[in-house]
UniProtKB/Swiss-Prot annotation:
Its EC number is 3.1.3.-. This is Probable phosphatase YcdX. GO terms for molecular function: phosphatase activity; zinc ion binding. Zn(2+) 2 binds at residues 15, 40, 194. One of its GO terms (biological process) is bacterial-type flagellum-dependent swarming motility. It comes from Salmonella heidelberg (strain SL476).
Amino acid sequence: MYPVDLHMHTVASTHAYSTLSDYIAEAKRKGIKLFAITDHGPDMEDAPHHWHFINMRIWPRLVDGVGILRGIEANIKNINGEIDCSGKMFDSLDLIIAGFHEPVFAPHDKETNTQAMIATIASGKVHIISHPGNPKYPVEVKAIAQAAAKHHVALEINNSSFLHSRKGSEDNCRAVAAAVRDAGGWVALGSDSHTAFTLGDFTECRKILDAVNFPEDRILNVSPQCLLAFLESRGMAPVPEFAEL
């Protein structure tokens, strides 16, 4: 099990069922040292208001030895790579994930999807691209992986893609992992939990990584220190409380 989980949703995204406190309790139970709350960006129908993300600044950094990152799963809005995260939201957030979601950006052809994803990667605003192996959004995998490595953006392997959502992702995700390996980039693992019970579950992700002999030292989740070094290299100020992790 990895001690870091980078993708989950709370009751603020109303199709999810757990609170911040629920995740903290489950993290303590499972030995998760650091996690990121990444509720859906405000352009989704049941997403929280942008004030929700701005007000994350009131959260404690550390609760009972568990570190909490303030994040968002933003929506890629168009082929220019614009996302539904802006202004003061950036000032409060540590981690920006962005991906395709049908209510905001309908599936297009491979060329258009690739253009939108690369523009998002190149924007400098995003740390991780969520579920890039979604079969509803075909992309040029090699081009995406090379762009991500160039711009120091991680591509996600999403455990939920193999269980509850985005069925048929396995082949695409193996291709993503292999392309990231060859490009010398990073992968991020996300449980994409919508309930705290699945926090830290990367069982299916591990199968994908093993299938392509993915190097362990290019997985952001291997330790809090690895993930924090990545974020700090992208401009996040060091968080003194996280020195205890």
